[in-house]
Amino acid sequence: MLGAETIVAIATPPGRAGIGMVRVSGPDARAIVSRFVTSIAWQPWQAHLAKLLDQQGHEIDQVIVTFFERPRSYTAEDLVEITCHGSPVVLRHAVERALEAGARLARPGEFTLRAFLNGRIDLPRAEAVRDLIDATTLYQARIAAQQVEGSVSRRIAPLKEQLLELIALLEAGIDFAEDDISVAPPAEILRRLSPVLEGTERLAASFQYGGLVHQGLTLAIVGRPNVGKSSLFNRLLEQDRAIVTEIPGTTRDVVSETAAIGGIPVKLYDTAGIRETEERVESLGIERSYQAIVDSDLALVVLDLTRPVTAEDASLIARAGARALIVANKCDLPAAGDVPAEAIPVSALTGQGVPELRSAILDAVAPKGVLEHETGFITSLRHEQLLREAVEYLQKAREAVASIPHEMLLLDLYAALRPIDAITGATTADDILNRIFSTFCIGK
């Protein structure tokens, strides 16, 4: 399904830069670019030095033109990339000349949409392109790159193939029903259905960890005044973001910032010290501290090892419940007491124990090693929801194998096939595709 129109867009971020790129894709890409660059050989997949011209034929810039001949291009169409100096004026001029020559401005994500529609990539790979662009940590980029190479698609394909084989078996059983030949007894159906169901369930369940890669964690740092919450906040961020003083109540409101812990984006919340107070502004800050515990995935309850554990400390730990990680700060000081059971000793001042704290944060949300070594999990909420839908129909089919005719069983199996196909884009509605690709940047 090659695009009938030729599209153009700037493919590099806005603003001044050393270089910039304009992309042109479609049946007339080569002819359109020929209108505003000097003559080149147009050898496919080779870089050609040329000059970008204005309407009067004056040189605007010296550029590199690369022609990718269909179908061996990103979009599977004729594609031309013009690399020039990254002046916004020069880039806009190249786009304007392409528009004058018959191209139209590309919509967000339209280059990747064409790659999908033309069979160059499937939908999970297209979505992974967006995730790679949006990656804020190297770990996110690594997982997205694996998905661009097909890690999700490779796990979906055998499930679909096994399901289609079972459907074909049942369809054949219906064809031979008049001859009293049973080609698909219940035991055989269950033998074939069980691995499909179990594989789909495992893949859906992998979102529990894969979702962390994409969505990240929220983590509240809470405790009494002057236990070192802001110092720990700064230490985890590896920058001085929060104000640190010896005056109790310095932090009056929740301060948030994002850090990378083990490659996972973690939204950190530094909160007001929790204590009894009649001061109105501080009281509001303390209320927000309590709310931060409720809203966060984890709560670091910070204790001061130079002071005894109090009822307020115990109350905070109880309030955080299973989400609590107890941090015993100031372990470097001579006055530090014994570390409470289950607490992680750290020094926010020197960094002692902070690597162990980072590991404990990751271990609290995923089994040790899962995030480091697992690469086949899904990171898309859309994929997880569709897999859960498929699981529902597969479970219905398994429960009814021995009690309903094959025709009825097939209804559930076909119903399970639809969401699986929707993941890969085989049967995805246009409005869903538009919603997905509208989240891409223009030029990609």
Swiss-Prot record:
GTP binds at residues 226-231, 245-251, 270-273. Exhibits a very high intrinsic GTPase hydrolysis rate. Involved in the addition of a carboxymethylaminomethyl (cmnm) group at the wobble position (U34) of certain tRNAs, forming tRNA-cmnm(5)s(2)U34. It comes from Solibacter usitatus (strain Ellin6076). This is tRNA modification GTPase MnmE. The lineage of its organism: Bacteria, Pseudomonadati, Acidobacteriota, Terriglobia, Bryobacterales. Mg(2+) binds at S230, T251. It holds the Pfam family TrmE_N. Belongs to the TRAFAC class TrmE-Era-EngA-EngB-Septin-like GTPase superfamily. TrmE GTPase family. K(+) binds at N226, T245, I247, T250. NCBIfam families: mnmE_trmE_thdF, PRK05291.1-3, small_GTP. Residues 216-366 form the TrmE-type G domain. Its cofactor is K(+). Keywords: Cytoplasm, GTP-binding, Hydrolase, Magnesium, Metal-binding, Nucleotide-binding, Potassium, tRNA processing. GO terms for biological process: tRNA methylation; tRNA wobble uridine modification. Gene3D superfamilies: P-loop containing nucleotide triphosphate hydrolases, Probable tRNA modification gtpase trme, domain 1, tRNA modification GTPase MnmE domain 2. InterPro entries: G_TrmE, GTP-bd, GTP-bd_TrmE_N, GTPase_MnmE, MnmE_dom2, MnmE_helical, P-loop_NTPase, Small_GTP-bd. Binds 1 potassium ion per subunit.
